[in-house]
Amino acid sequence: MDDTKKRIHKYIEKHDLIRSDDKLLVAVSGGPDSFALLHFLWSANLVPKEAIAVAHLNHHLRENAEKEQLAVQTFCEERDIPFFIEEVDVKKRAEKLQKGIEETARIVRYDFFEKVMAENNINKLVLAHHADDQIETILMRLVRGSSSIGWSGIQPKREVRGGYAIRPFLPITKAEIIEYATKHALPYEIDESNTSQEYTRNRYRTQLLPFLSKENPAVYEHFKRFSEETSEDFQFLEELASNLLKKNLIQNGKQSTLLLSDFKNEANPLQRRAIHLLLMYLYNDDGRVITVNHIYQIIQMIQSENPSSSIDLPKKLTVIRSYNELHFQFGERHAPPEFYHQLELNDRIELDNKASIRLKLKSSVVQTNGLNGMLLDAEDITLPLIVRNRVNGDRMTMKGQAGSKKLKDIFIDAKIPRQERDNLPVITDYTGKILWVPGVKKSAYDREFSRSKKQYIIRYTRNIGGNESMHNDIQKVLISEDELQEKIRELGRELTAEYEGRNPLVVGVLKGATPFMTDLLKRIDTYLEMDFMDVSSYGNGTVSSGEVKIIKDLNASVEGRDVLIIEDIIDSGRTLSYLVDLIKYRKAKSVKLVTLLDKPAGRNVAIEADYVGFVVPNEFVVGYGLDYAERYRNLPYIGILKPEIYSE
């Protein structure tokens, strides 16, 4: 075996590119690189010959395209190699897609390859990129200003639909490939466009590469090592960045929101890598769209003292900084819709944000529900009321303050995101006096209840969630889905060891523990029985009522049984304390408690779990079974609910 073949075999083994049970689809254009690749694979016995197939796409871009197609077809027919040929007029397709010819050619090429792989149960696409391509790619990316991940160049293996694209020729040069193809008399065609100085890559190939090779003949090996070491570094950093995104990224349809409270405290290299990873996801792994400048612009937004800013990126991606959130969304920016409603006594109006506003005459002692209800003295205002957008120059008279304050400054003080301010309802009386911005601020016209005065009450009701995503109501992802499952696997192992051979009765506490219990039981590898109780002291609020009620009792007897209680969270502890005492009273042999979450700061009674998943801070947490007003149970993670949601 000559040195060239040895290096190829060593490279394949090092990067685990080809296994004996793989099925290979070799992309053959008709040039020396791909013909040499096909011949090498055909003769190397890495896989059975019947596991090799060929794909050729005729782009109809070159004069010798028909000769190339015929050469590929003839070569395959002579050796009984299955081949797939497709013809596409790339110029017409590019006009239709409104993309460049090179980008369009790449799209149709990979669509064709992946289609053939899927239809023929092929798991590896083999491409003929070589060491010259590697150097050209790295240099082009550095000069163009690509993000640092691009510095590692062409990777030996990457995922495609249905399998992997592999590049076993990366360790050898173009000259070695030509020598191989000539030695074996392969019928390749030379692409006449390869000498045109019109293309950037050709200028690098004909001008820079000869210079570098002359300066140091070992340049190919040096760039290969640079690529591999850089790739290893970035893979390590990417794993850290991926975990960082899992904790701080909320995805909602067309919008992705990065929570900045913790993210902005991470080291700059990790922030940059996470932003690059997110952009790669948003751009469907098309790294050519992303430059270093894009990433640095976003990092500057994150680190800026300005809480509200935005930038526009390629392909209509807008990045919006809104205090401690960074929103990524595709599409044109639209001006917010203007609205103007008159609100008569006993009327109710529905707003586009799925909220409603009602005006009634006060009839009894009224509590105005925080920021979402308001009492007005009839003598202070003129009906009908007006509900509208804000306008330039809006000012509100404030309680306990002389003069008035700009609405813009009120929004800034309340940290209302800039993109949301134009959508907030502003309530005035008929003369134009601003009375209230629901959920934000009340004016000096807000009154206490009076039996002697005629008063009106305005109610602002928000339909929590509405058509919007529930993810938008989350202030911070506290525990990611992956972290939950990792902890559940750990608890499952501990409980398997604890209860092996004891056939415990596992009691799930409805409703919150259901997702946790479902996943946990899959990880307990021993015989058990399960039952459920619904014992509550909450209701629809955020604070325990203190009264414990049995809504659903057990069907099974606990007498003489080892009982394991599964709960979603221990907060005040009243419910669980009552339940443990009850089961002990019913003569259970043993009672142990496993809880996903423990909130020690909320404890009112002395109770501790035997097994704890996570200790959480004294915040209102929802998701993965935990709710507020019966919502958010189906979130796949544990998140902290925004205070404005449960203070409404």
From Swiss-Prot:
Entry similarity comment: In the N-terminal section; belongs to the tRNA(Ile)-lysidine synthase family.
Record-listed E.C. numbers: 6.3.4.19, 2.4.2.8
GO molecular function: ATP binding; guanine phosphoribosyltransferase activity; hypoxanthine phosphoribosyltransferase activity; metal ion binding; tRNA(Ile)-lysidine synthase activity
Cofactor note: Binds 2 magnesium ions per subunit. One of the ions does not make direct protein contacts.
Gene3D superfamilies in the record: 3.30.465.60, 3.40.50.2020, HUPs (3.40.50.620)
Assigned keywords, A-Z: ATP-binding, Cytoplasm, Glycosyltransferase, Ligase, Magnesium, Metal-binding, Nucleotide-binding, Transferase, tRNA processing
PANTHER family in the record: TRNA(ILE)-LYSIDINE SYNTHASE-RELATED
A biological process term (GO) from this entry: tRNA modification
Domain of life: Bacteria
Pfam families (UniProt xref): ATP_bind_3 (PF01171), Pribosyltran (PF00156), TilS_C (PF11734)
Subcellular location field: Cytoplasm
Reaction catalyzed: IMP + diphosphate = hypoxanthine + 5-phospho-alpha-D-ribose 1-diphosphate; GMP + diphosphate = guanine + 5-phospho-alpha-D-ribose 1-diphosphate; cytidine(34) in tRNA(Ile2) + L-lysine + ATP = lysidine(34) in tRNA(Ile2) + AMP + diphosphate + H(+)
Name of the protein described by the UniProt record: Bifunctional protein TilS/HprT
Gene: tilS/hprT
Description of its domains: The N-terminal region contains the highly conserved SGGXDS motif, predicted to be a P-loop motif involved in ATP binding.
Named cofactor requirement(s): Mg(2+)
Cross-referenced PROSITE patterns: PUR_PYR_PR_TRANSFER (PS00103)
Its job: Ligates lysine onto the cytidine present at position 34 of the AUA codon-specific tRNA(Ile) that contains the anticodon CAU, in an ATP-dependent manner. Cytidine is converted to lysidine, thus changing the amino acid specificity of the tRNA from methionine to isoleucine.
CC per GO annotation: cytoplasm
InterPro entries to which the protein is assigned, alphabetical: Hxn_phspho_trans, Lysidine-tRNA-synth_C, PRibTrfase_dom, PRTase-like, Rossmann-like_a/b/a_fold, TilS/TtcA_N, tRNA_Ile_lys_synt, tRNA_Ile_lys_synt_N
Record's keyword annotation contains Magnesium: yes
